[in-house]
Amino acid sequence: MLSRLFKAGEKVLSNLVSKKDIYMASRNQEKSPKVQELYDLCKETFTGKAPSPASMAIQKLCSVLDSVSPADVGLEEVSQDDDRGYGVSGVSRFNRVGRWAQPITFLDIHECDTFTMCIFCFPTSSVIPLHDHPEMAVFSKILYGSLHVKAYDWVEPPCIITQDKGVPGSLPARLAKLVSDKVITPQSEIPALYPKTGGNLHCFTALTPCAVLDILSPPYKESVGRSCSYYMDYPFSTFALENGMKKVDEGKEDEYAWLVQIDTPDDLHMRPGSYTGPTIRV
């Protein structure tokens, strides 16, 4: 009798252990939110210095970033018939047309000493002017919409014009090479820029309502020299090369521009918003 009770008890205990194992296994198999996976990868990858573009970790990060959808970060795609507010449109400073567009909304997902995760929500025609990312790497995912990107890298060694009477008040001007001048969508390859390659200086113009998920490493930090500077671009023909400067190949002048640092543009209108996606476990 006792032996049968012991055997029955062992069977019940075995069933309980089996069910617990199944439950724990199912819990372990549950996928973390995509934004959590992205955060965990950023935490593993970034050490405080701009990463190498050839690293396997960066390739993995870009792969995960590319899979993020608006719903993964608490967004819904905005109708193309969005309201208009203050702003300008056009991809060139010489042919932009005055137009009303709402302010750009900035959503802060996470920021620490080594990286920033954030979202920019653009109404149609809104613009983030040409700006830089000193000693930083930036990875961007277009979540929805169409965005025009124009990007430059500095010509090395530096080619700087310090005197020119033709354009008063616009100097010094530094030569940069055009890296990108195109429209990107959610189907586009992840734009990745680095301190000296990939288009470290870029400007955005929203052709439709759109949202961009950005990862920056390391973050902007003025106290250590990583402050955001804005620029105006001028055609290569605006200034004459000074003696001793490296010549630009004939017929390729359109691939270069002179960049002049300016104050933060008055028409840059940005407002903070609330991130409503999954909470990140830090």
Curated annotation (Swiss-Prot):
Keyword Ubl conjugation listed: no
UniProt xrefs under SUPFAM superfamilies: RmlC-like cupins
InterPro entries on file: PCO/ADO (IPR012864), RmlC-like_jellyroll (IPR014710), RmlC_Cupin_sf (IPR011051)
GO CC annotation: cytoplasm; nucleus
Coiled coil: none
UniProt superkingdom: Eukaryota
Substrates-to-products reaction catalysed: L-cysteine + O2 = 3-sulfino-L-alanine + H(+)
EC primary class: oxidoreductase
pH dependence: Optimum pH is 8.5 with CGGAIISDFIPPPR peptide as substrate.
Positions that bind Fe cation: 131, 133, 202
Entry's Gene Ontology BP terms: cellular response to hypoxia; detection of hypoxia; peptidyl-cysteine oxidation
Note on how the cofactor is bound: Binds 1 Fe(2+) cation per subunit.
Keywords: Cytoplasm, Iron, Metal-binding, Nucleus, Oxidoreductase
GO molecular function, one term: iron ion binding
EC number: 1.13.11.20
Cofactor(s) the record lists: Fe(2+)
Main location: nucleus
Keyword Cytoplasm set for record: yes
Compartment list: Nucleus; Cytoplasm
Record function comment: Catalyzes the oxidation of N-terminal cysteine residues (N-Cys), thus preparing the protein for N-end rule pathway-mediated proteasomal degradation, upstream of the N-end rule enzymes ATE1, ATE2 and PRT6. Controls the preparation of the group VII ethylene response factor (ERF-VII) proteins for degradation via the 26S proteasome N-end rule pathway. Acts as an oxygen sensor that controls the stability of ERF-VII proteins, which are stabilized in flooding-induced hypoxia, and regulate transcriptional adaptation to these adverse conditions.
Family: Belongs to the cysteine dioxygenase family.
Name of the protein in its database record: Plant cysteine oxidase 3
Lineage: Eukaryota, Viridiplantae, Streptophyta, Embryophyta, Tracheophyta
